[in-house]
From Swiss-Prot:
Disulfide bonds join 42-84, 127-177, 224-278, 417-483. Residues 580-913 form the Protein kinase domain. Changing residue 544 to F: No effect on binding to THOC5. Coiled coil: none annotated. Residues 20-515 are extracellular. This is Macrophage colony-stimulating factor 1 receptor. Residues 794-816 are annotated as: Activation loop. Disruption phenotype: Mice are born at slightly less than the expected Mendelian rate, and the number of surviving mice is significantly reduced after three weeks. Mice are considerably smaller than wild-type littermates and suffer from general skeletal deformities with shortened limbs, increased bone density, and decreased volume of femoral bone marrow. Mice have decreased numbers of circulating monocytes and lymphocytes, decreased numbers of tissue macrophages, paired with an increase in the number of circulating granulocytes. In addition, mice are deaf and have reduced male and female fertility. Glycans are attached at residues 45, 73, 302, 335, 389, 410, 449, 478, 491. Residues 540-572 are annotated as: Regulatory juxtamembrane domain.
Length: 977
C-alpha cells in the first residue's frame, strides 16, 4: 500500500547513552495551534533518519547538537506521525511522536488520495484529524453519501486514519471521512481505494542488516523474517551450509502472516563470521537473501582511490578527485585541505560525501582549474581507529610560450629561444629563405633539433622554463630564423629576421614650420579629433547584450558568473540551412530580426514544423555576433523545459548565425492581456477579494496599437510595427487561424491568470535550479503558445533606442528600472532573489490585465526614494488577497525574506486548486466579441514593450490615493546604469 513519499532527513548527531533515540519534547502526542513554531529534536548515538508525511516548511538545523526539525509556521498539513530511527544500530529501535495542528478551518489532513492493496490485506485510508478532540465524532462514508458496506469491518485510528480489515474487491470505492465541528459537519476530500485480487506467490523475505561488521566481543543481531498472505510457509536461517536452531516467532500484521528468526549474539567471535542466508519457502516457491557478517580484531579505517594520486590536467579543465573509505565504526571527522604551494587567490573547496553501509565516498570538485590551484590536496579522516589520510598531487599542463632574442657572444651572433610550458616542450630551429612568417621543414634550408636545451627553472607544480641557443656565426640578410616548440598541450613558434641598415643621406637644413607643414598638421589634428568623436559616439551606441547570468559559485554576497563565450557549443544542435523555408518577418529591431520559418526534418526526417528564427542584420558588429552566439550557447546549456522558449536548433556554419526556437502563436503575454482587456466590461472579483476597491473600474481603455519589441530584435517604433501573426500558406494554416480566432473570443477567467502565473513561476524555478539569473522578468518577455502554455523568453536585452524618444542615454546599458529590485537599482547586485522581486511586478501586470507598473509615477528621484523606503503598489483589481500577499512578499526589501520560486509555485497551485473547486467564482466577462485577435505570432525573442503611462482615469484606479495627483508625463521604463 502506497501512502505517498515519506519525508526523509539525515544528520550526524552527538553521542549519548545507550538505548533508543529520544525525541524532545517528550510524550507520544503534541498539540499546537496554526502559525506556531514547532521544533522536534532527536538525540541518538549516531546518524539518524526522520520519516513522516511530506509537509511544507520543515527545515533541518545542522548546527544543533542533535537532529532537529523546525517549522516556523505550522499548518494543518504538518499533522502526522514523525519517527526518528538510528541508522547504524538496528537493535536500538526508533521513537515516534504524533503532531496535531489544531485548525478549526481544516479538520482533516489527507496523506494520500489513492490507496491500493491486495485482497485480504489491511487497507489504511490516511485521513488524519487535526484536533484529537474530534476522534469521538468521526465516521466513514462512501462517495455520494452512501453507507459503508455492512460486511466491511473497519475502525478509526487518530494516528493512521480509517483502517479496513481484510479488504475485499467489493470494498473498492471512493471514501469520504466525516466529523462534527461545533455542531457542523466537516468532510474530507475523497480517497480512492483499489483492492486487487490476490495471486499466490512465494513468501517475501527480509534479512537485516544487509551487511554487518563487529569488533570481537561486541554484541550483534541478525534478523531473518518472511511474510505471506497464507500461513503455510517456513523460514530458516543458515550460516554457510549449517542450519541454525533459532526459535521461530509468528505474528499477523496488516493482513499478512509474519514469521521471524532472530539470532542475538552478546559477544561475537571469529567463528561467528561468515555468509548468512535467510530462506523462506511454500508450495509456490522459495526465496533466499544473503548477507556477509565480518568480525574484526579492532577498529579500521582504509582510504583508497581508483584514480592515480598524481593527476595532470590542462589549465581551465575540470577535475573530480574521488576517495573511497571503508571504516568501522563510523567516521567522526573528515576534511579536504589544500597544502600549497600557491596560497594566493584560493577559493573555498567544494566537496560532497556519499554514504553507504561501512563505506564512504568523498568527492572534491575542482572546476575550471586555475594556475594557482595546482599543488597537493589532502583528505584526512578519523574514527576510533585513529587518523588516516590520502594526498593527491595536481600538476597543470600549459601550452608552450616562446620568445626569441639575439645577442652577440664572443664576436659571434647567437639566437636565444626562451620557452616555458608543461610538460617540457621540445625545441626545433629552422632557417628559411626570405622574409616570411611561415615555414615548415619542407621549405627550410636547415633544421636543428635541440634535444638538450638548458633548463632554467623546474619548480614542482609550475611551468618548466628552458633556453635553447642557436650559434649562427654571422646573421644572413634576407633570411628568417624560426624557433618552434611543441608539447602534449599545444605548440608555438616565433621568428627572427636580420635587419639590413643602409647608408643615410643628410638632407639640407630647412625650416620645419613652413606654412605647408603647419596646414598638414592642422588637418591631421582635425581628423584625429573627428575620429575620436566618432569612436566616442560608437562606444555610446547601445550594443546587443546578453542579459542572463549563470552563477559559477558564490561566497556570501559575492557572486562569480560564467563567461558565456567560454561555454561549449554542441554540434548536435546544428541544422541544415537548406531545410529552412522562411516566411514573414515577425519583428525587426536595431540589431536583427525574428522570422517565421518552416523547418523540414527537425527531429524526424519527415517532420514539418513551424519555428521562429532569430538572426542578426548584415551590418551587425563582431561583438553583437558574439552576443548572439553566447545566447545560443546558454540556451543549449540550460536544456529543455516546458515553460521556457526552448532551443530547437541552430545554423552556425556557412553563413550568418541563425537561432531556431519554438514558435509561440499567441505572442507575448503583455499584449495578450491587453487585447483581452479591451473586451472587458468590468472586473470579475473572487470571493476573497475586497469588493470596495475601485468598484467603478468598469472598462480598461487601451490604445489600439502597442509598440512590439523584442529586446532590439523586433522594435521599429509605432509606424513600422509588424503585427506578429501566423502566415497562412495552406489550408491547415487557415484552420489554425480559425482556432486562434475562436480562442480570442473566449473571456478570461481568474483561473487563466493563476495558470499564467504558475507556469512562469515553474519556468523561473527551472532557471534558478540551473543557477541562471534572468534579470529582465516581465510580461513582455513571456510568450504564449498553443494551449495557453506560458514560456519565458527574451534572454538578451537590446532595444531600438535610436528611434525611440522614451530612452535617455546615460551610459552603455539600459535597465528595466520599474521591474528591478532595490539592490539591483542601487548596488547593481543581481541574484535569484532579485528575479523574485521582478516576478512580483510581473504578477501585478498579470492581475491588472497589462497595466504599467507604478502607474502615474515617473522614473526620477522621487521614484527611487519610494522604492528605497519600501513603497508597494496597491492591490490590482483582479487579484485575490492571497495573490496580493504573494506580491508583497516578493517585494520585501530584505532579499533573504523573499519566497523562493518553488514556494511561489506551491502557493499558486494551492490557489488554483481552490479556484477550480469553488464554483462561486465567475468568469471575467467579455463584450461578446473580440476587438483584437489572439493570433499574433511569437518567437523566442518576441516581446512587447507597453506604451508609457496613459492619462486615463481608469489606470489610476490601481494607484495609491496619494499618487493620483502625480502628473502623467512621458516616462521611461529603462535607464542607463
Amino acid at each position: 500500500m502506497e501512502l505517498g513519499p515519506p519525508l526523509v532527513l539525515l544528520l550526524a548527531t552527538v553521542w549519548h547513552g545507550q538505548g533508543a533515540p529520544v525525541i524532545e519534547p517528550s510524550g507520544p502526542e503534541l498539540v499546537v495551534e496554526p502559525g506556531e513554531t514547532v521544533t522536534l529534536r532527536c538525540v541518538s548515538n549516531g546518524s539518524v533518519e526522520w520519516d513522516g508525511p511530506i509537509s511544507p516548511y520543515w527545515t533541518l538545523d545542522p548546527e544543533s547538537p542533535g537532529s532537529t526539525l523546525t517549522t516556523r509556521n505550522a499548518t494543518f498539513k504538518n499533522t502526522g506521525t514523525y519517527r526518528c530511527t538510528e541508522l547504524e544500530d538496528p537493535m536500538a529501535g526508533s521513537t515516534t511522536i504524533h503532531l496535531y495542528v489544531k485548525d478549526p478551518a481544516h479538520s482533516w489532513n489527507l496523506l494520500a488520495q489513492e490507496v491500493t492493496v491486495v485482497e485480504g490485506q489491511e487497507a489504511v485510508l490516511p485521513c488524519l484529524i487535526t484536533d484529537p478532540a474530534l476522534k469521538d465524532s468521526v465516521s466513514l462514508m462512501r462517495e455520494g453519501g452512501r453507507q459503508v458496506l455492512r460486511k466491511t469491518v473497519y475502525f478509526f485510528s487518530p494516528w493512521r486514519g480509517f483502517i479496513i480489515r481484510k479488504a475485499k474487491v467489493l470494498d473498492s470505492n471512493t471514501y469520504v471521512c466525516k466529523t462534527m465541528v461545533n455542531g457542523r459537519e466537516s468532510t474530507s476530500t475523497g480517497i480512492w481505494l483499489k483492492v486487487n485480487r490476490v495471486h499466490p506467490e512465494p513468501p517475501q523475505i527480509k534479512l537485516e542488516p544487509s551487511k554487518l561488521v563487529r569488533i570481537r566481543g561486541e554484541a550483534a543481531q541478525i534478523v531473518c523474517s518472511a511474510t505471506n498472505a497464507e500461513v503455510g510457509f517456513n523460514v530458516i536461517l543458515k550460516r554457510g551450509d549449517t542450519k541454525l536452531e533459532i526459535p521461530l516467532n509468528s505474528d499477523f500484521q496488516d493482513n499478512y502472516y509474519k514469521k521471524v528468526r532472530a539470532l542475538s549474539l552478546n559477544a561475537v567471535d571469529f567463528q561467528d563470521a561468515g555468509i548468512y542466508s535467510c530462506v523462506a519457502s511454500n508450495d509456490v516457491g522459495t526465496r533466499t537473501a544473503t548477507m556477509n557478517f565480518q568480525v574484526v580484531e579492532s577498529a579500521y579505517l582504509n582510504l583508497t582511490s581508483e584514480q592515480s594520486l598524481l593527476q595532470e590536467v590542462s589549465v581551465g579543465d575540470s577535475l573530480i578527485l574521488t576517495v573511497h573509505a571503508d571504516a568501522y565504526p563510523s567516521i567522526q571527522h573528515y576534511n579536504w585541505t589544500y597544502l600549497g604551494p600557491f596560497f594566493e587567490d584560493q577559493r573555498k573547496l567544494e566537496f560532497i560525501t556519499q554514504r553507504a553501509i561501512y563505506r564512504y565516498t568523498f568527492k572534491l570538485f575542482l572546476n575550471r582549474v586555475k594556475a594557482s590551484e595546482a599543488g597537493q590536496y589532502f583528505l584526512m579522516a578519523q574514527n576510533k581507529a585513529g587518523w588516516n589520510n590520502l594526498t593527491f598531487e595536481l600538476t597543470l599542463r600549459y601550452p608552450p610560450e616562446v620568445s626569441v632574442t639575439w645577442m652577440p657572444v664572443n664576436g659571434s651572433d647567437v639566437l636565444f629561444c626562451d620557452v616555458s610550458g608543461y610538460p617540457q616542450p621540445s625545441v626545433t630551429w629552422m632557417e628559411c629563405r626570405g622574409h616570411t612568417d611561415r615555414c615548415d621543414e619542407a621549405q627550410a634550408l636547415q633544421v636543428w633539433n635541440d634535444t638538450h636545451p638548458e633548463v632554467l627553472s623546474q619548480k614542482p607544480f609550475d611551468k618548466v622554463i628552458i633556453q635553447s641557443q642557436l650559434p649562427i656565426g654571422t646573421l644572413k640578410h634576407n633570411m628568417t630564423y624560426f624557433c618552434k616548440t611543441h608539447n602534449s598541450v599545444g605548440n608555438s613558434s616565433q621568428y627572427f629576421r636580420a635587419v639590413s641598415l643602409g647608408q643615410s643621406k643628410q638632407l639640407p637644413d630647412e625650416s620645419l614650420f613652413t606654412p605647408v607643414v603647419v596646414a598638414c598638421m592642422s588637418v591631421m589634428s582635425l581628423l584625429v579629433l573627428l575620429l575620436l568623436l566618432l569612436l566616442y559616439k560608437y562606444k555610446q551606441k547601445p550594443k546587443y547584450q546578453v542579459r542572463w547570468k549563470i552563477i559559477e559559485r558564490y561566497e556570501g554576497n559575492s557572486y562569480t558568473f560564467i563567461d558565456p563565450t567560454q561555454l561549449p557549443y554542441n554540434e548536435k544542435w546544428e541544422f541544415p540551412r537548406n531545410n529552412l523555408q522562411f516566411g514573414k518577418t515577425l519583428g525587426a529591431g536595431a540589431f536583427g530580426k525574428v522570422v517565421e520559418a518552416t523547418a523540414f526534418g527537425l527531429g524526424k526526417e519527415d517532420a514539418v514544423l513551424k519555428v521562429a528564427v532569430k538572426m542578426l542584420k548584415s551590418t551587425a558588429h563582431a561583438d553583437e555576433k558574439e552576443a548572439l552566439m553566447s545566447e545560443l550557447k546558454i540556451m543549449s546549456h540550460l536544456g529543455q523545459h516546458e515553460n521556457i522558449v526552448n532551443l530547437l536548433g541552430a545554423c552556425t556554419h556557412g553563413g550568418p548565425v541563425l537561432v531556431i526556437t519554438e514558435y509561440c502563436c499567441y505572442g507575448d503575454l503583455l499584449n495578450f492581456l491587453r487585447r483581452k482587456a479591451e473586451a472587458m466590461l468590468g472586473p470579475s472579483l473572487s470571493p476573497g477579494q475586497d469588493s470596495e476597491g475601485d468598484s467603478s473600474y468598469k472598462n480598461i481603455h487601451l490604445e489600439k496599437k502597442y509598440v512590439r519589441r523584442d529586446s532590439g530584435f523586433s522594435s521599429q517604433g509605432v509606424d513600422t510595427y509588424v503585427e506578429m501573426r501566423p502566415v497562412s500558406t495552406s489550408s491547415s494554416d487557415s484552420f489554425f487561424k480559425q482556432d486562434l480566432d475562436k480562442e480570442a473570443s473566449r473571456p478570461l477567467e481568474l483561473w487563466d491568470l493563476l495558470h499564467f502565473s504558475s507556469q512562469v513561476a515553474q519556468g523561473m524555478a527551472f532557471l534558478a535550479s540551473k543557477n541562471c539569473i534572468h534579470r529582465d522578468v516581465a510580461a513582455r518577455n513571456v510568450l504564449l503558445t498553443s494551449g495557453h502554455v506560458a514560456k519565458i523568453g527574451d534572454f538578451g536585452l537590446a532595444r531600438d533606442i535610436m528611434n525611440d524618444s522614451n530612452y535617455v542615454v546615460k551610459g552603455n546599458a539600459r535597465l528595466p528600472v520599474k521591474w528591478m529590485a532595490p539592490e539591483s537599482i542601487f548596488d547593481c547586485v543581481y541574484t535569484v532573489q532579485s528575479d523574485v522581486w521582478s516576478y512580483g511586478i510581473l504578477l501585478w501586470e498579470i492581475f491588472s490585465l497589462g497595466l504599467n507598473p507604478y502607474p502615474g509615477i515617473l522614473v526620477n528621484n522621487k521614484f527611487y526614494k519610494l522604492v528605497k523606503d519600501g513603497y508597494q503598489m496597491a492591490q490590482p483589481v483582479f487579484a485575490p488577497k492571497n495573490i496580493y500577499s504573494i506580491m508583497q512578499s516578493c517585494w520585501d526589501l530584505e532579499p533573504t525574506r523573499r519566497p523562493t520560486f518553488q514556494q511561489i509555485c506551491f502557493l499558486l497551485q494551492e490557489q488554483a486548486r481552490l479556484e477550480r473547486r469553488d464554483q462561486d467564482y465567475a468568469n471575467l466577462p467579455s463584450s461578446g466579441g473580440s476587438s483584437g485577435s489572439d493570433s499574433g505570432g511569437g518567437s523566442s525573442g518576441g516581446s512587447s514593450s507597453e506604451p508609457e503611462e496613459e492619462s486615463s482615469s481608469e489606470h489610476l484606479a490601481c494607484c495609491e490615493p496619494g499618487d493620483i495627483a502625480q502628473p502623467l508625463l512621458q516616462p521611461n521604463n529603462y535607464q542607463f546604469c
